[in-house]
A protein has these predicted regions:
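Register position in tetratricopeptide repeats
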Residues: 41-42, 75-76, 109-110, 143-144, ...
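Residue-level recognition of tetratricopeptide repeat
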Residues: 37, 71, 105, 139, ...
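Alpha-helical segment of the N-proximal tetratricopeptide repeat
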Residues: 28-54, 58-61, 68-75, 236-243
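Structural marker of alpha-solenoid helical repeat scaffolds
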Residues: 58, 92, 126, 160-161, ...
């Protein structure tokens, strides 16, 4: 056996060992990932997080387990922990466009509006074809005070979601902030086929053709089930609050927003919007200067 042959065999053996270790690690990570998913699917979030945390310590360079833990934190309404995991991943995977979206979401849930918007903008920069679908970005524009950009986002979203009262309302809110309620009503987007209760009455209210009482009556009309009633109340209260806020009736707005924020966990992303808005109003109330002589 000559020296070159021995060297080649040595390299092949070493490469085989390294490949074997890599494959073994991959199998271990995938097995652990499946255990984490299984634990979470069975309702044991604490076990799933512990499995992920232990696995991350053993495989610090692998992002699969970090991603799983971050998503669990997000689902369990722990946005700060989710943000930390997503940030760690993005340092290792700066081209992971989906993680910018996910981090933007959990930053919004923490009222970090500018940071959230930066992440959503980065996501759109990387995946421009998603811009028309990204209504979440429009919401953050509103809370960040970027009303013209918000108006544009909701107009673009209208091209792919033509019968959504919520999109029309948020467009109205952005226009009202820059041009006043008369212009907002003038440019209010016409919606004819959104069957969610009581959004037909909400649309009429913002169009200047409906009343608060009509919305409240629609919420209870038809003897809805407990679940349907809760959903009707949520949407009714949220958009009544936003309507009165746009009209400058702060106390009435705050009352309805507070009602919509109760039980927000049951209403998905918009439930989180209600909570965020409620906390945002509370923050602004605390920051208002106290009148001289008041206690």
């Amino acid at each position: 056996m000559n020296r070159n042959t021995r060297t080649l065999r040595t390299l092949l053996v070493a490469a085989t060992c390294v490949l074997g270790q890599a494959l073994g690690q991959a199998e271990t990570v995938e097995k652990l990932a499946n255990e984490i998913r299984n634990a979470y699917s069975l309702g044991d979030a604490a076990k799933a997080v512990k499995l992920a945390t232990d696995g991350i310590q053993k495989h610090p360079d692998n992002t699969t387990l970090l991603t799983l833990r971050g998503r669990i934190h997000e689902e369990e309404n722990q946005p700060a922990k989710a943000e930390a995991d997503f940030t760690t991943i993005l340092k290792k995977e700066p081209n992971n466009s989906g993680l910018y979206h996910r981090r933007g979401v959990v930053r919004f849930f923490q009222l970090k509006f500018d940071d959230s918007l930066a992440d959503f903008d980065k996501f759109i920069e990387m995946v421009p074809g998603q811009e028309p679908y990204h209504w979440q970005r429009g919401l953050v524009h509103y809370y960040a005070g970027k009303y013209k950009a918000g108006r544009k986002q909701f107009e673009v979203h209208q091209t792919v979601n033509t019968q959504d009262v919520e999109n029309a309302v948020w467009h109205y809110l952005c226009v009202a902030k820059t041009d006043g309620v008369a212009e907002a009503e003038k440019h209010f987007i016409k919606i004819t086929s959104d069957r969610r209760v009581p959004l037909k009455q909400i649309h009429a209210l913002f169009a200047g053709k409906g009343t608060e009482q009509q919305v409240l009556d629609a919420i209870k009309a038809g003897d809805p089930s407990a679940g349907a009633l809760a959903r009707n109340q949520f949407y009714g209260h949220l958009y009544l609050g936003l309507y009165f806020e746009s009209q400058g009736k702060e106390e009435k707005a705050a009352k309805y927003i507070a009602l919509s924020a109760k039980g927000h966990e049951s209403h998905g992303y918009m439930g989180q919007v209600a909570r965020v808005h409620h906390e945002w109003l509370q923050q602004k109330a605390k920051s208002k200067p106290t009148r001289k002589g008041s206690k």
